[in-house]
Amino acid sequence: LKETPLHAAHVRLGGKMVGFGGWSMPVQYPSGILAEHRAVRTAAGVFDISHMGQFVAGGPGAQAWLNTLFSNNLDRIGPGESQYGFLLNEAGGVIDDLIIYEYAAGEFLLVVNASKIAEDYAWLEGHRVPGVQLSDRSDRFAALAVQGPRAPEIFTAFFGAEVILPARFGVSVLQRDGLPFFVARTGYTGEDGFEWFFPARAAEVVWSELLDIGARFGLIPCGLGARDSLRLEVCYPLNGSDLSPERTPLEAGLGTFVDLKKEHFSGRDALLQVKAAGGPAEKLVAFRMTEKCPPPRPHYAVFSADGATRLGETTSGGLSPTLAAGIGLAYLPAAAARVGAPIQIDIRGRRCQAVIEKKPFYKSANLPPKPVATVAI
């Protein structure tokens, strides 16, 4: 397993290390998943996300080139802004979901999923056109996600009161003690927060300083367990589980991040055919358990309310600390994917009652306003 530059720091803090996407990562610290989850919802938590891939694209035509491969529309953003979207195969299936940050005019940072770094880079490189530079800086840069309602105070305490907070989905390039930081107001928790990208050589120093400065704001280190329960409450998809090359963004209910008005991008024609046929045959639904039973996990069978028909299977699942109930995501036939419809989940041989709910399960009251430009109309 690969190790992030903070591996030794996690072990020192008592992090329980597990394999994830080929990386050794902390699933939790001695504080426990529940405490870590609640810290992010009420104060702040910091996650090591150095396992994620970081590519830089630039040069004349970089934006136009990226727009032929990216489902969203980069023409809608400018320097200091970002956009979420997908790399799609020609069938419209998801190769990866990612955020593209325009950190300077015509210069882009692509942050991709850890297990997809090599595949994504090869795919992008295979489509690269003359004049566009593409580089993989994943091994040279670390990344931390500081998430929670007190994240802005921590940002100010760390970088200085004179440094302006980036807007939501914004990105700023900052200097601190001679070290460059790319700081974006993005995250995977549904709370306000920031993702910091900086040279890996400084990872240990930044981590310990951040924990020291953040302590008075209630900041604690958090692992993958809390990251998963937090993202599940806001129905953010996990690539490889809820998203795959066999599933389109339209099936996943993420058509907002696909701009079919663009002249061309990989997968567009296939998605137009899906729309012309009346929409996807299956849809990703959110469900909540309505009786006391173990929490749902991925690959559990989903049945109709009467238990007679197998409708599909779960892609994600777990316990929601906020709802104090099991929640999950599942692909079901479009006709069965109705909010309020009762279903059954087969949990270890027992049929448990659940109901399809409107996404998301949780909405933070602490989010800054969303800029209009980041969403394709």
Regions found by a protein language model. Give the residues of each.
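Conserved, structured C-terminal
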Residues: 1-21, 25-29, 103-377
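Acidic, proline/glycine-enriched N-terminal capping motif
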Residues: 1-88, 93, 377
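Acidic active-site catalytic centers that drive phospho-/nucleotidyl reactions
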Residues: 48, 97, 195
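Well-ordered mid-protein domain cores that form the structural environment of catalytic cofactors
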Residues: 73-127
